[in-house]
């Protein structure tokens, strides 16, 4: 719905309710105006629930409705139906205003200020340096990237952060395997990306550990050497990490994932220790008999039991920190650096308990309030054969997935058009559109069973379908330009069929969908909106002759409508990090 009309109606209704409340000597705390689509289009374009006001004002619904209708006057057609007031827009004005707004604002169409001046940090990706990115990482990456763009479109100041986990037992496992089986190989010698090479050694370690009881002890010894700064160990660690990080960054570049700041855990992991010691001095946590520093956190309570607490270690007795301690240090670092209003962690649902604990402790130690921290948990990406396990090599690597999809598309392109020269770029863009859309169209809290064939479909709810509709509209516009028809004035009054009206209503709701996606922290809102718009235009295109040389005025109007659809689809694709292609 046109936001200007929505605001206008809300202002009228709010003013009317306030006046009625004053007349009836009733104190109003808040006016909640519920607007929704009527169940049938013939009832109107918008339905307003009046019954709620009737309960507050203790007046008959018909009295309130009559007063609102008086205030609306002849601006909109109105009709009372029981507890609802149905509104019909002036279609001609609505169509003209919507098309003009989109085609004038172009890539800025849909941008709003609901989060104006709000400083938001989004931490996402956060890979380990012992393996390449896999499809689960891709879901994390695209959620973080897309949500960042959506929040920016709603006026927020967004900072995208990546904390690379480059220390700990996971990288030591790859290091140990490299020492035993590496034979001084390199990415160049092995003809592999660095992250893939390191991932191979991670799998080799787990094979080795199955038959060697001392493997875990060897890992702990290697970790101790690293912590003590042993020169050879640190050199090996730096070399393997460099290979892994270079490989991971290459995948980011391929998938168009960017960050404003990248942290390495090895550079900041000690900061949290100082915070805990300060909390101990202030009596916010306590020292256990064995020397460990702890804090009591509330457990989940049921309806009949009193709140129970359990002990949580923040610093071990030997003075070493745990992941929670490091995360506390990271919060302080970012608060000092960015002075954020909100920090969002895009992390899988298996970490829900960790973040509940982290946020509670951060609040308890006075670092920041719990409601400034958000764990945006997402569901797992599973394969038809079951859950992925990196240590067993049972994963779909991101690079390999993109390559496999691209190869499938290249074969199809060569079948249809062997003369295409840029087929590799086209195939890459289609594969990225397929992956990103497939991972975003499902609500983020739900698990996904990844289906390659479904993701590549050109006829269903998929990225390639939306890309195809965009390319189809561009082709229509190019054909129109070749005709060079005179179009001094455009008569939007000629757009009278129901398909055109349906498309206009969908286009006009784009800003509302961005706002909803921002508030819900859910890119699937935009993904499914883009599919709805693309599908509606496809139906229109099949049923309607858009370019008719014998009806130039009607053609001009329909072309301007098509331009508005394409611009809105392109804006959606930007928010979803899906490549737009003029031709496919």
Curated annotation (Swiss-Prot):
Listed GO MF terms: arginine-tRNA ligase activity; ATP binding
Keywords assigned by UniProt, alphabetized: Aminoacyl-tRNA synthetase, ATP-binding, Cytoplasm, Ligase, Nucleotide-binding, Protein biosynthesis
Location in the cell: Cytoplasm
A GO CC term attached to the entry: cytoplasm
Domain of life: Bacteria
Quaternary structure annotation from Swiss-Prot or TrEMBL: Monomer.
Protein name: Arginine--tRNA ligase
Gene symbol of the encoding locus: argS
